[in-house]
Amino acid sequence: MSDSEEEIKQNTDPVDNAWSLKIPAFRQEDNPHGMVEESSFATLFPKYREKYLREVWPLVEQCVAEHQLKAELDLVEGSMVVKTTRKTWDPYIIIKSRDMIKLMARSVPFEQAKRVLQDDIGCDIIKIGNLVHKKEKFVKRRQRLIGPNGATLKSIELLTDCYVLVQGNTVSALGPYKGLQQVRDIVLETMNNVHPIYNIKALMIKRELMKDPKLANEDWSRFLPKFKNKNISKRKQPKSKKPKKEYTPFPPAQPESKIDKQLASGEYFLNQEQKQAKRNQERSAKQADAAKKQDERRNKDFVPPTEEAPSRKRQAEDSSKVDVKALKAKLVKANKKSKS
């Protein structure tokens, strides 16, 4: 059995942890004839990155030349281009180099961006601009992701082994593929108003649990922190709510018109003089009613208030109460007068 067959047999065995598998290296012997057609990718960069890119571009050309690629910098158009050559033997390196210039256009330094050319390193550009509608909320949640003095961002980098850069409406991440998955989950949940400290705590707990072989096949959910949403609706409730009418499949009855009301009361059949006489009668009745109410309002001040008559029970209580001391003093006084 040859070495290649043994490698294939080893790869087909069951794997407990898929993340532990190493990506097989692609060597030049695997593609000795090179590339038939030229492939190229271009990306634009902002004006403020022009000075930095001009300084590091010789290093970029030297880096891509190791993989038989060609890089061009167009300062007039503001674009970076990477191309394959006839000597390029790795078909996927052009995709990796495209990711590198994308990261450099998004303010990632060249020293970090060139790591994406490695086989076990990938990148992820997460768009967060359209996840929050209000600008104030977006800025607040983005700052929450960075943390005070960049502490939150640094802890995310240490736990995921990724380089993370928050720039404008995007978050650029660079590192191993498992770490990129964790970074994307943290960023998206942070923009959905879940504080990143919960996910950071969960990652720290998982890292400690992975060290214990006894807990390898157990559920870890009981160890992880549980987040409870405490958002309360801030909409002011009306003081008096109108009760909803019961639903009926039939449309409401048509309201009576003025002519219908006149027909019902018989006014429709009266002539002009009779209608005028009826209106005068109604007017005089209203005036008499208003005059009566006005007289009652004027005479209200002259009406004496009603006084409560003393009840018999209260009178009996007053008569039953006798002041003994006052009676004694009265008798002593009367005796003195009689002696004198």
UniProtKB/Swiss-Prot annotation:
Domain KH intervals: 124-192
CDD domains registered for this protein in UniProt: KH-I_KRR1_rpt1, KH-I_KRR1_rpt2
Keyword presence, Ribonucleoprotein: yes
SUPFAM superfamilies per UniProt: Eukaryotic type KH-domain (KH-domain type I)
Region (Disordered): 228-259, 271-324
Primary localisation category: nucleus
Places the protein is found: Nucleus, Nucleolus
Listed Pfam families: KH_KRR1_1st, KH_KRR1_2nd
Keywords: Coiled coil, Developmental protein, Nucleus, Ribonucleoprotein, Ribosome biogenesis, RNA-binding, rRNA processing
Comp. bias regions, Basic residues: 228-244
Coiled coil: 269-302
An example Gene Ontology biological process: rRNA processing
Domain of life: Eukaryota
GO molecular function: RNA binding
GO-annotated cellular components: nucleolus; nucleoplasm; small-subunit processome
Composition-biased stretches (Basic and acidic residues): 275-301, 309-324
Subunit structure: Monomer. Component of the ribosomal small subunit (SSU) processome.
Entry function: Required for 40S ribosome biogenesis. Involved in nucleolar processing of pre-18S ribosomal RNA and ribosome assembly. Binds to RNA. Required for female germline development, cell viability during eye development and for survival of dividing cells and epithelial cells during early wing disk development.
PANTHER family in the cross-refs: HIV-1 REV BINDING PROTEIN 2, 3, KRR1 SMALL SUBUNIT PROCESSOME COMPONENT HOMOLOG
Recorded family membership: Belongs to the KRR1 family.
Protein name, UniProt field: KRR1 small subunit processome component homolog
Organism of derivation: Drosophila persimilis
